[in-house]
Amino acid sequence: MSTFSSIFGSSGDNANVDKSIDSLFKASKGPVSRQYSDRARTVINIPADAATEESGADQSESIEETEEDKERDIKAEAKRAKKTRQKKDLNEDLESKYYNKLLKEQDEEAPKVEKDEKVESGSGSDSDSDDEEDQSGETKSKRAKTVDLKENELEKAERTVFVGNVNASVVGSKPMYKKFKKLFSQYGKIQSIRFRSISFDDAVPRKVAFAKKKLHSSRDTLNAYVVFAEKEPSLKCVPKLNATEFEHAHLRVDHVAHPAPKDNKRTIFVGNLDFEEKEETLWRYFNSKTDNDVESVRVIRDAKTNVGKGFALVQFKDTLSVNKSLLLNDKPMSAEKKRKLRISKAKAHTKPSILSPNHIDNSKKAYASNKSKMSAKLSDQQRTKLGRAQTVLNKSDRATAGKSRNIIEGQRASKGDSIAGIKGLKSNRDRKIKKPRIRDRSTKFKNERDSMASELKNGPKK
């Protein structure tokens, strides 16, 4: 037997044949007939016009679809760019809006608390309806602004006394400073003393010159501001200390918030003075001629250089002294000084022409146009405080009084904003560009350097 028959068995062995499979093969119908194999294939004939129309429609539909896709893409890109731009704009002012919202919530807390207390007495349904009305009545949030009315400075001015013609030795030595402070402390507790109108000898920064105590030799007086702890002592000391001598100099004492009235009938104008004339010489000269009747002497000086402008105002206690002093017109003060004084009665300021911008009517119009928007939002009490600040306070405080303060702690400042504490920071329009200082030494160095460079290139000159 072969290996094949040993594994699978012989073909004649009917015992190993499966009957179900054998029955399937017995029931077969034989081979496929010839007529089914030779039958022609069915083909559908499409007319030429219909085919071209369908192909054209397909092409037009595809073109329209591509154009629509392009338009859709362009619109989507535009929307995307707009969204990014809006997000940028929102994010730039996000921090300031947050802080402004906090300020607004703090301002609205007080009236809301009072309203809630009133609503508690009513029914619950009423409170729900009120809440709905509050939500519906909300307006767009505005930028929080606080108007600077200089209330702290005004309160400080009520306790401040101006002292003129003070001996400059008060700044130089501590014993003199203590003596000056003791003169005013007998009327009440002193909070602080500020010295102004100091003339220095060297052209260095004022803080450095003050630390070195290098004062100008020809200007031996200065002004001071004495701040008391309370208001009453400041009012008491003015009439008692005015025209008193301190270290051989007559003091001119006046209150900052409540100055003494200026009476033109008791005042004279003194002209043709030396630019370096001192107040003390005028005090002594007119006191000797009017039996110590001088109330105050004021030499008009330049704000920057602190040098006199050549004229002064002298106020007396009595009008009879004015007539006595008028007899001294066209006469020198002493034999050493040959300048003849020009003495006349003090007059009120003459009104400028109606065509001048300094006329009262024109200045009122300009002031009203600038301040109308701001003053419309202020109450009567706030306007009173603002007007008081502009008449009483100094030059720097007057410039900032009434302006809105937008920059607060934690808020981002924009370019060009003036910020308190940063000296010399102005807007881009007013900011000056610093130019380098050109000196003879630097120009000589540059010329020598250029000549050496040219010699190296071209050789020495023959």
UniProtKB/Swiss-Prot annotation:
RRM domain segment(s): 159-258, 266-348
Subcellular location: Nucleus, Nucleolus
Biased composition, class Basic and acidic residues, residue ranges: 69-79, 87-120, 137-147, 439-452
Organism, as annotated: Debaryomyces hansenii (strain ATCC 36239 / CBS 767 / BCRC 21394 / JCM 1990 / NBRC 0083 / IGC 2968)
Family to which the UniProt record says this protein belongs: Belongs to the RRM RBM34 family.
Keyword Lyase applies: no
Any one GO biological process: maturation of LSU-rRNA from tricistronic rRNA transcript (SSU-rRNA, 5.8S rRNA, LSU-rRNA)
InterPro entries from the UniProt entry: Nop12_RRM1 (IPR034777), Nucleotide-bd_a/b_plait_sf (IPR012677), RBD_domain_sf (IPR035979), RRM_dom (IPR000504)
Biased composition range(s): Low complexity: 365-377
Protein encoded by which gene: NOP12
Ranges of biased composition (kind: Acidic residues): 51-68, 127-136
Cellular component terms (Gene Ontology): nucleolus; preribosome
Name assigned to this protein: Nucleolar protein 12
SUPFAM superfamilies: RNA-binding domain, RBD
Spans annotated as Disordered: 27-147, 331-462
Gene Ontology terms for molecular function: rRNA binding
Biased composition (Basic residues): 337-350, 429-438
Annotated Pfam families: RRM_1 (PF00076)
Keywords noted in UniProt: Nucleus, Repeat, Ribosome biogenesis, RNA-binding, rRNA processing
The protein's role, per its UniProt record: Involved in pre-25S rRNA processing.
